[in-house]
Amino acid sequence: MTKRYFVTGTDTEVGKTVASCALLQAATQLGYQTVGYKPVASGSEMTTDGLRNSDALALQRNSSLPQPYSAINPYTFAEPTSPHIVSADEGRAIDAAVLSRGLRTLEAQADWVLTEGAGGWFTPLSATLTFADWVQTEQLPVILVVGVKLGCINHAMLTALAVEQAGLPLVGWIANDIQPPGARHGEYLATLRCVIPAPLLGEIPWLGVSPSQAATGQYLDLSPLERA
């Protein structure tokens, strides 16, 4: 049976892709056929191969099962803004059925599929659909990425509560050091351990620029996911 997870974050730019790549690496090391899925991505660049998003490309590189870019990222937008805004501007609606079909295709090939969201938990995909709505429909277990900085405790508690209210399992969380650790870093982590009702899968240290290029799977312990 395919293991399926959804990665969300406490905010945008908290390192969801860094954590997702680490998860894919760690699962591959456990012997799984892995694939990462970025169904919706904004902030992309035109290349000789067409519009490409750096986060989706990172997931593609870190998947053990080769996939064409279109399978990894069915909705790609150039402007780095909320998906519901840019999709409306371009007249290209985001269809939940397309997201689900893409997920089914990957699940048929891999035994460990990780879907990475965009922005935070309630990121709108249209005037009537949020990413949270789709995840709830798919009944995906959730992994929360916390960008460790001032304010992250409140954001983590709010997101964990929202996941719980959606009736979805929060199966783990990852602390991602998105800046050099400050004086209160240890206290932030200690508090997060107390207030997030899920096991800590690991802490990814501050790696400077281009952290998605690093071998980050070593920082994670997936045994709580194996037991779930």
Mark where each language-model region is.
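Switch II (G3) loop of P-loop NTPases
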Residues: 99, 103-127
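Short internal beta-strands
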Residues: 38, 143-146, 171-177
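N-terminal phosphate/diphosphate-binding loop that engages ATP/GTP or pyrophosphate donors
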Residues: 4, 18-93, 97, 102-105
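Inter-motif core of Ras-like GTPase G domains
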Residues: 126-149
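C-terminal lobe/tail of nucleotide-utilizing enzymes
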Residues: 160-228
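Conserved glycine(s) of the Walker
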Residues: 14-15
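Hydrophobic anchor at the beta1->P-loop junction of P-loop NTPases
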Residues: 7
